[in-house]
A protein has these predicted regions:
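Short, small-residue-biased leader/transition segments that mark boundaries at the very start
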Residues: 1-3
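Helix-start (N-cap) detector for alpha-helical repeat units in TPR-like alpha-solenoids
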Residues: 17, 34-35, 68-69, 85, ...
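Canonical positions in the second alpha-helix
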Residues: 26, 59-60, 94, 111
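Alpha-helical linker/edge segments of TPR/alpha-solenoid repeat scaffolds
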Residues: 50, 80-90, 120, 130-143
Length: 143
């Protein structure tokens, strides 16, 4: 049995491993319970296990594309692992989902300048940038 209180007790004791075991147990029973999923990624990040946190958050982003918090958590792990291009992409999606399209566009432009991307990654960024610019233009007041 997993409860948020038990997880918090384990985290307060500094036993992130026990907290994660409780969370994973809870997720086997309630696989879509987002508070456990947030807590799992957060505990991995707090323990400095950013590669594992990144793997978890990438799965969550695939499953819950419209959850800005998962994108933010993914961005945090990308920053910790030095993946600048992907960091800016993740932040762009977070900002977009929060309704701040200009900030999302800025992040995609930073991703373009970050370098290190292959042709496919750069094409994805360019396409997303084009879509966001179109959406922003359609929201502008008509004269």
């Amino acid at each position: 049995v997993c409860s948020s209180d038990l997880v918090n007790v384990q985290l307060a004791k500094g036993d992130a491993r026990a907290a994660r075991a409780l969370l994973r147990s809870g997720l086997t029973r309630f696989p879509n319970y987002q508070p456990f999923r947030y807590a799992l990624v957060q505990s991995l990040q707090d323990s400095g296990e950013h590669e594992q946190a990144l793997a978890e958050s990438e799965e969550l982003v695939k499953e819950f594309r419209k959850d800005a918090r998962f994108h933010e958590m993914r961005a945090r792990s990308l920053a910790a692992t030095g993946q600048r291009l992907r960091l800016h992409q993740a932040l762009a999606e977070q900002y977009y989902l929060m309704g701040t399209i200009p900030a999302a566009i800025d992040q995609l432009q930073m991703a373009q300048k970050a370098g290190g991307g292959d042709f496919y990654q750069m094409s994805v960024i360019e396409a997303r940038l084009r879509d966001m610019r179109r959406e922003l233009a359609s929201q502008a007041p008509q004269k």
